[in-house]
C-alpha cells in the first residue's frame, strides 16, 4: 500500500512542501524546501509529488493512492515509465496502479519558457550556454530560472547535508556555481530536500531523475519546458540502460502541461567543451570534480572526473594552464589505467570524436586504445570464469532434492 498527502508550511523565509507517505508498515515524511519568494510560481497539482515518489511506489507495488489532483496525461505516461523499469529492474520494480482523487485532462498550449537544473558541471554549463546563445536548434528555449537542488542521496549531497565540517566547503562550491551562472546573467534558486534521510532499494544512478524532474515540475504552470542536461551520450558504446536519465524512459516523464528536454544527449564531452570554448570563465571555473573536501577554490586534479576533463582538454589541444584550475596540475597518460572501470565510456567518446574530426593527438588515441583493449580482455576473462563457476555450482546443486534448499545453496554462492 502507498498513500500520499501533501501539506504546506512556511518558516524562516522558506516554504516547505511536505509529503506524508503511508507505506503500510510505516509512515515517512519528506520535504522540498524553497525560498518563500518562489511560492507564487508553484503548482497546486500533485503531479510533482507523484514523480518524486515513483521509485518508492514501484518498490512497494500495488495500489498507490494520491490525495490530490493529477494530470491524466502524466498518469498515462507514467504507466509506460513503470513498464520500462519493470523490464530493466524486475527484482526491484513492481507493478503499480496510481489512483488519484481527481484526474485533470485540460489541454494546454505550451509556452517557450523553461526552467533548468544547474550544477555548475560540464553538462549543465554547456546546456545553459547552448540555450542562452541560441545554439540548441528547434528545441532552443527561453530559460527563465535555474534550480540548484541539494539533499539528494548522492555522496556529495549526503555529506553536505549531514556533515557540519563540510557545509562551509559546500557553500564555497555553491558560490562558485553561482558565479558561473551570473556570468551569463542568471540567478540560481537553491532548493533543499531531506531525501537523503530516507531509505531506498535503488542505486542513486537509477533514481536521480525523479528528484530533479519533480522539483522542476513544481513550476510547470509557468514554465512549460523542463530542461535536464544529459549526462550520457547516445553513442552505442556510451549509452547505458538502466540509468536514471536515458532516451527511452525520459520520454515518459511528460504531460500535456510540460515538455521535458534532455539536452546534450547527442554530444560527447568533447563536443560540449567545444560549445563553450569561447566562454573562458566557465572553462576555468566549472565544477567537474568529485572531490568535495578540498580547502582551496581549485579542483583536486586527481579524481576520475578531473582526470577525464584534463584528458578532454588535451584531446582538443586546448592551451589551458592546469595550474589555474587544479591542485594537482599534472597530466600523464600512464595514469589512466586505474580509472578505466569508471571512465571507459569517456575514453570511447574521445576515440569516437577522433573518428569524426581526426584532430585528437596520436599519442592519446594510441594510449586509450591500448587501455580499452586491455580492459576488454580482463572483462572477457572474468565473464568466462564467472560462467564456468556458475555452471559448476548449478551442477553440484542438482543433487540437493529439496527445491528451496537448492535455491538457497545457489544464492549463497552468488553472494
Q: PLM features: what roles do these ranges have?
A:
Residues 1-21, 48, 52, 57-117, ...:
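Nucleotide-activated chemistry modules centered on ATP-dependent adenylation/adenylyltransferase
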Amino acid at each position: 500500500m502507498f498513500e500520499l498527502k501533501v501539506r504546506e508550511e512556511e518558516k524562516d523565509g522558506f516554504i516547505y512542501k511536505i509529503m506524508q507517505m503511508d507505506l503500510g508498515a510505516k509512515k515517512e515524511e519528506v520535504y522540498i524546501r524553497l525560498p518563500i519568494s518562489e511560492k507564487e510560481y508553484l503548482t497546486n497539482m500533485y503531479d510533482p509529488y507523484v514523480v518524486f515518489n515513483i521509485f518508492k511506489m514501484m518498490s512497494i507495488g500495488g495500489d498507490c493512492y494520491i490525495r490530490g489532483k493529477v494530470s491524466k496525461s502524466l498518469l498515462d505516461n507514467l504507466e509506460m515509465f513503470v513498464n520500462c523499469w519493470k523490464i530493466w529492474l524486475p527484482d526491484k520494480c513492481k507493478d503499480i496502479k496510481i489512483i488519484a482523487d481527481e484526474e485533470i485532462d485540460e489541454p494546454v498550449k505550451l509556452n517557450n519558457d523553461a526552467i533548468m537544473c544547474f550544477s555548475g558541471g560540464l553538462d549543465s554549463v554547456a546546456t545553459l550556454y547552448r540555450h542562452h546563445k541560441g545554439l540548441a536548434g528547434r528545441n532552443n528555449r527561453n530559460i527563465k530560472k535555474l534550480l540548484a537542488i541539494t539533499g539528494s542521496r548522492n555522496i556529495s549531497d549526503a555529506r553536505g547535508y549531514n556533515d557540519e565540517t563540510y557545509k562551509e566547503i559546500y557553500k564555497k562550491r555553491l558560490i562558485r556555481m553561482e558565479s558561473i551562472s551570473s556570468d551569463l546573467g542568471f540567478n540560481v534558486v537553491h532548493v533543499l530536500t531531506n531525501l537523503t534521510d530516507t531509505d531506498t532499494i535503488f542505486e542513486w544512478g537509477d533514481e536521480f531523475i525523479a528528484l530533479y524532474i519533480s522539483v522542476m515540475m513544481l513550476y510547470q504552470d509557468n514554465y512549460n519546458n523542463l530542461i535536464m542536461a544529459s549526462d550520457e551520450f547516445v553513442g552505442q558504446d556510451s549509452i547505458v540502460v538502466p540509468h536514471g536519465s536515458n532516451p527511452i524512459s525520459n520520454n515518459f516523464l511528460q504531460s500535456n502541461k510540460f515538455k521535458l528536454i534532455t539536452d546534450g544527449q547527442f554530444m560527447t564531452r568533447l563536443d560540449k567543451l567545444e560549445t563553450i570554448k569561447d566562454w573562458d570563465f566557465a572553462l576555468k571555473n566549472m565544477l567537474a570534480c568529485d572531490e568535495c573536501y578540498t580547502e582551496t577554490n581549485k579542483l583536486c586534479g586527481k579524481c576520475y572526473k578531473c582526470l577525464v576533463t584534463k584528458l578532454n582538454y588535451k584531446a582538443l589541444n586546448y592551451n589551458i594552464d592546469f595550474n589555474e584550475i587544479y591542485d594537482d596540475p599534472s597530466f600523464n597518460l600512464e595514469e589512466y589505467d586505474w580509472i578505466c572501470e569508471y571512465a571507459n565510456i569517456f575514453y570511447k567518446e574521445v576515440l569516437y570524436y577522433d573518428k569524426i574530426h581526426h584532430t585528437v593527438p596520436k599519442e592519446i588515441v594510441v594510449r586509450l586504445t591500448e587501455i580499452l583493449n586491455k580492459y576488454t580482455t580482463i572483462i572477457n576473462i572474468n565473464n568466462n570464469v564467472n560462467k564456468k563457476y556458475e555452471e559448476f555450482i548449478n551442477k553440484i546443486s542438482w543433487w540437493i532434492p529439496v527445491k528451496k534448499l537448492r535455491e538457497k545453496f545457489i544464492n549463497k554462492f552468488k553472494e
